[in-house]
Amino acid sequence: METIEGIIVVTTSEIPGYRIVEVKGIARGGVVRATHLGRDIMALLRNIKGGEVKEYTEMMAEAREEALRRMALHAKELGANAVVNMRFATSNLGGSMAEIYAYGTAVVIEREEK
């Protein structure tokens, strides 16, 4: 279980030890990233040689984290304290641009009584 910006985020439909008391709607956060010439040149050279293109891997990892953060902030705006069923979607926007989109169901949860 991960907490981002004070929001619990999980990929499952339930959170052990908690119950969902209210559904607030879809929380979403997206980011579009484009590479720059230096990264493109390094990527081209790595592509010729083969292997992982670390410049793009790092860029996409940063974009995923930012999309998650934006989704958590949107969930907070909706009045939620958790996001369940979180997923990522990616889109190639042409050239060297890509969109990373994080989304899930914003909910209010409470601890279950034992």
From Swiss-Prot:
InterPro entries: UPF0145_dom_sf (IPR035439), UPF0145_YbjQ-like (IPR002765)
PANTHER family, per the entry: UPF0145 PROTEIN SCO3412, UPF0145 PROTEIN YBJQ
Protein family according to the UniProt entry: Belongs to the UPF0145 family.
NCBIfam families linked: PRK03732.1 (NF002989)
Name used for this protein in its record: UPF0145 protein PYRAB04900
